Design a protein with these regions (language model features):
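Membrane-helix interface and helix-disruption motif detector
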Residues: 1-3, 24-34, 174, 209-220, ...
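Interfacial transmembrane-helix boundary/kink motif in multi-pass membrane proteins
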Residues: 2-13, 35, 57-94, 245-267
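Alpha-helical membrane-inserting segments
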Residues: 18-26, 44-52, 89-102, 183-187, ...
């Protein structure tokens, strides 16, 4: 578990270094380096996960079953559907409360460039849903989950929140990370968090684009509230199934292991968060 934590932590340190490098370049080169900054740790993490798998097989003396983290059956889709609206509502509420608290100290989120809707959806919803979920959910699922589901959930959420390097995003990113990974672990697939991440970010983009008026905001929030109510009713009707599903997302493995690399990551992200104020 400790070596696995060290590896995942170092992958995120590598990401921070590469993102910092990409920030020095503008235009298409800066954009390209931004995506390369995610691709490099993802590729390294994938190959390292195969190394850890071989080591576990050597110790156990038996071959492990191939993972099905990219599988997404119709049954899993039906289970995920009622979880979408409540998840978006939880993340939205956490984001709103964080913004209100930080506004007391004069801290606000950086404005998002107002471009056409399709461009904003690709840049702020689709790309993050794929790149961030592969790095912060898929890689921990492959490397950490075989040792501890609780540790996998905690660390993936911690890294996901730290890497935003923003005090205004850290709390709700951690909450989103916990919820996303819990659902991924429970369903045994990375697709739920990719879908949830995209829908959550797309909802924020639509709200920013068309929710400037009180009427627009009211309509969007009203639709979300109605979907949450319907979803909660569906979950309550199948509370035994969902209860067993969520309990299966936890185990008695190690939930926290300290490594110097983690301290280095916290210090790097903290420094960048302060400089971004």
């Amino acid at each position: 578990m400790t070596n696995a934590i060290k590896l995942v932590t170092l992958l995120d340190v590598l990401l921070i270094c590469l993102l910092t490098l990409s920030a020095y370049f503008g235009g298409w080169l800066g954009e390209a380096l931004y995506y390369v900054a995610f691709l490099v740790p993802i590729i390294v993490g994938f190959y390292c996960s195969e190394y850890f798998k071989r080591k576990r097989e050597e110790v156990a003396g038996v071959a492990e079953e191939p993972d099905e983290l990219f599988s997404f059956s119709f049954g899993k889709a039906k289970t995920l559907l009622p979880l979408i609206a409540p998840t978006v509502a939880i993340v939205f509420t956490a984001s709103l409360l964080t913004s209100l608290f930080l506004s007391l100290f004069g801290i606000s989120s950086a404005p998002v460039e107002n471009r056409n809707l399709l461009t904003m959806l690709v840049a702020h919803a689709l790309a993050p849903a794929i790149m961030e979920e592969l790095l912060f959910r898929y890689i921990p699922l492959k490397i950490l989950m075989p040792y501890s589901k609780r540790g996998c959930i905690f660390y993936s959420a911690l890294y996901f929140s730290l890497i935003h390097c923003s005090f205004s995003q850290l709390p709700y990113a951690f909450i989103a990370g916990v919820v996303f990974m819990m659902i991924d672990v429970a369903l045994g697939s990375v697709w739920p968090s990719i879908i949830l991440h995209f829908i959550n970010n797309a909802s924020s983009v639509v709200l920013m684009k068309y929710g400037s008026s009180a009427v627009g905001t009211g309509i969007l929030l009203g639709v979300l509230a109605a979907l949450v109510i319907v979803s909660v009713v569906c979950i309550v009707l199948k509370k035994k199934e969902y209860g067993e599903l969520m309990r299966g997302a936890f185990d008695k493995g190690e939930a926290f292991v300290y490594t110097p690399a983690l301290l280095a990551l916290v210090m790097m992200c903290g420094y960048l968060a302060v400089t971004n104020l």
